[in-house]
């Protein structure tokens, strides 16, 4: 069975939680918890509350996600 593709949406960081987790408000109004992707962590990209980010979510659990891009 083929793996379903991830859902990508834009959002804004609302607050920083512990262990590099963030609360993100998506454009549609939902709030999810998200962690930083490995490449962003590897390149020391810092994320602060108020930053606009792109979040990748699994179609199986829409309450969690992974931050894959920070807009400038």
From Swiss-Prot:
The keyword Zinc does not apply. Gene3D superfamilies: Nucleic acid-binding proteins. Residues 1-72 form the S1-like domain. Keywords: Cytoplasm, Initiation factor, Protein biosynthesis, RNA-binding, rRNA-binding. One of its GO terms (cellular component) is cytosol. The keyword Electron transport does not apply. SMART domains: S1. PANTHER family: TRANSLATION INITIATION FACTOR IF-1, CHLOROPLASTIC. Component of the 30S ribosomal translation pre-initiation complex which assembles on the 30S ribosome in the order IF-2 and IF-3, IF-1 and N-formylmethionyl-tRNA(fMet); mRNA recruitment can occur at any time during PIC assembly. This is Translation initiation factor IF-1. It comes from Bacteroides thetaiotaomicron (strain ATCC 29148 / DSM 2079 / JCM 5827 / CCUG 10774 / NCTC 10582 / VPI-5482 / E50). The gene is infA.
């Amino acid at each position: 069975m083929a793996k379903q593709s991830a859902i990508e949406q834009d959002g804004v960081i609302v607050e920083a939680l512990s262990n590099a987790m963030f609360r993100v408000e998506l454009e549609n109004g939902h709030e999810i918890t998200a962690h930083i992707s490995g490449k962003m962590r590897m390149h020391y990209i810092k994320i602060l509350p108020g930053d606009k980010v792109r979040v990748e979510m699994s179609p199986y659990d829409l309450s969690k996600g992974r931050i894959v891009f920070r807009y400038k």
